[in-house]
Amino acid sequence: MKKLLQVLNDFEKQAPLYLNNNKMVSEANVGWHIMHSCLVINSIAKAIIVSDPALYKKKFSWKAFLVLLLNKIPRGKAKAPSFTQPASEVTMSMVLQQIEDARKSAESLLTADKRHYFTHPIFGDLRLPTAIKFLYVHT
């Protein structure tokens, strides 16, 4: 969890660069990527908090295993769900608000039961400790 919160601190330092863009890496600017990561944190935290541990389905996923082992998600292999895509126009205040919301969401996971989980469309059900690692790797 410390690593995830540190990433959010780093985002705050990078926020003034929100309009910067490197077309060799991505069509989207820095602000879009920060907001996307924050929206992912918010949506996953919400799903974890409301999950019912009794409905958890354990299933081994080689893809999840490799991503979490290598601490890297291959670029360009998946499309972000629409609810994790920021609006087309990104402002500094929007970026800072998303960082603050993501920090609150991440901190809410500190009191969540470790048996809670969220369902990833490719990796399946990920319990809280694994989900936190996934958030760090993704972010």
Residue ranges and their predicted role:
Residues 13-14, 75, 79, 86, ...:
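General secondary-structure edge motif
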Residues 12-15, 41, 45, 103-110:
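A structural signal for well-ordered alpha-helices, especially hydrophobic packing surfaces
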Residues 1-27:
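An N-terminal domain-cap segment
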Residues 8, 46-47, 84-85:
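Short acidic/polar alpha-helix capping motifs at helix-coil junctions
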Residues 19-70, 111-139:
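Short, contiguous alpha-helical
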Residues 1-4, 8, 30, 34, ...:
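Hydrophobic packing residues in well-ordered alpha-helices of helical domains and bundles
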Residues 67-116, 135:
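Acidic/histidine-rich alpha-helical segments that form the ligand environment
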